[in-house]
């Protein structure tokens, strides 16, 4: 799953490099490190959610399973919104701190701000994937991610080659493709007949449950960030 998600940025880089130019390629590449860090951290929290959900499922405790599922999604929404605001507001400062070359900085800022504008979809997908894995549906989450990866490549050609939108087009394509995987996985969970069934009105933070999920997932998230860095 991590490899497929990293392919978003890889596909953007290849198509931008071939059809826009070397500076645009460098701009997309400069944005890769913080994006990989984000993917790793959100997947770590998703692992924590999956562990907690699977424990309650194994114990046959449907009430706690439902609470864990809906708390996990609430964590994802909060984290996604915080990352959106932080990424859009601080994207330029982050790239400057990473010593991004001046000649590619403007394009890099455009790419990373648009990417973080849609990062909520990626974070929510990662959390739903953790829930699906806990429920024994890991193959389905990978299929949804594969569909999103194909969508990203198609939209890259539409926005970059067809509409000549440059790095902005690449970032928009990535956001829309992540929306695809997010919607597909949420739709499946909303139609599920087991304890992992999602009801949008039930998504809320239960403090004790949120603390448990974060305690389990945080070490993995930090480890993933270190590996990605």
Describe each region flagged by the PLM.
Residues 2, 14, 18, 51, ...:
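Transmembrane alpha-helix boundary and packing residues in multipass membrane permease domains
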Residues 13, 25-85, 122-141:
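Small-residue-rich hydrophobic transmembrane alpha-helices
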Residues 53-120, 162-218:
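Short alpha-helical transmembrane segments in multi-pass integral membrane proteins
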Residues 76, 131-155, 172-175:
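Alpha-helical transmembrane segments of multi-pass membrane transporters/permeases
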Residues 44, 85, 149-153, 179:
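Hydrophobic/small/kink-forming positions within alpha-helical transmembrane segments
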Residues 7-10, 19-22, 56-59, 134-135, ...:
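Helix-loop interface residues and adjacent transmembrane-helix termini in multi-pass membrane transporters
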Residues 37, 152-157, 182-186:
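Hydrophobic transmembrane alpha-helices of multi-pass small-molecule transporters
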Residues 1-51, 115-122, 211-229:
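Transmembrane helix-bundle signature of multi-pass secondary active exporters and lipid flippases
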């Amino acid at each position: 799953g991590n490899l497929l998600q990293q392919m978003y940025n890889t596909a953007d880089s290849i198509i931008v490099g071939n059809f826009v130019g070397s500076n645009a390629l460098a701009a997309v590449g400069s944005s890769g490190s913080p994006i990989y860090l984000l993917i790793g951290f959100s997947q770590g929290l998703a692992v924590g959610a999956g562990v907690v959900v699977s424990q309650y499922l194994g114990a046959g405790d449907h009430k706690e399973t439902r609470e864990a599922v809906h708390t996990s999604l609430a964590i994802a929404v909060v984290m996604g919104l915080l990352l959106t605001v932080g990424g859009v507001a601080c994207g330029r400062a982050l790239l400057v701190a990473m010593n991004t070359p001046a000649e590619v900085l403007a394009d890099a800022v455009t790419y990373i701000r648009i990417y973080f504008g849609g990062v909520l979809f990626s974070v929510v997908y990662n959390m739903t994937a953790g829930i699906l894995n806990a429920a024994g549906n890991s193959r389905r989450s990978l299929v949804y991610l594969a569909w999103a990866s194909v969508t990203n490549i198609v939209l890259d050609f539409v926005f970059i080659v067809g509409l000549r939108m440059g790095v902005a087009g690449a970032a928009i394509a990535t956001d829309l493709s992540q929306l695809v995987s997010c919607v597909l996985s949420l739709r499946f969970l909303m139609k599920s007949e087991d304890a992992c069934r999602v009801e949008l009105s039930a998504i809320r933070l239960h403090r004790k449950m949120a603390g448990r999920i974060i305690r389990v997932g945080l070490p993995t998230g930090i480890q993933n960030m270190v590996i990605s860095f």
